[in-house]
Amino acid sequence: VREDVIERANGERGIYGVVDKDPACIVLPIDSTPDGDFLYLVEQFRYTVGARFMELPQGGWEIADVYPEEMARGELREETGLSAERMTLLTTLQIGYGVMNQKQYVFLAEGLTHGEHDRDAEETDLEVHRVSVAEFEAMLLDGRIVDNCSAAAWGIYRLWRERRAGR
């Protein structure tokens, strides 16, 4: 966290608080079955807001030279125990550029296989949930999922999927 002395467009000087964060990733783990598509979500306690929330698997590593796909595969395995046959980078977003300079890579994970998770100490209470697409969308609309990154990633995925279907 830093405070920069800035000069605004009108010439006034001021202080601007900035949170410096390493890149992160968010993963849409989609399990396509004859019964439909399902997503894997994680539920965990978020200290900053003092409550448990459901969201897509996401996070970052404090390693300078990590490839985004490697980070996404690692976060998926760490939090859910899932591995993906295919990872597709859908886009890169800025999470909250009003106060933070962190970028987030949005990945689609397909061809999922189950394995053992490898959670960090702060993730020991994390729970994994498999939900249908209809349930996930209902959760976004009724406020059970309030994570802006999960909502944005889903919107990006829907646009990507529609454009691929229109080929």
Label every model-predicted segment.
Residues 151-167:
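Short, amphipathic C-terminal "tail helix"
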Residues 1-28, 34:
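Acidic, metal-coordinating catalytic segment for phosphate/diphosphate chemistry
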Residues 14, 23-26, 31, 59-149:
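Unchanged
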Residues 24-55:
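A glycine-rich, hydrophobic loop/mini-helix early in the fold
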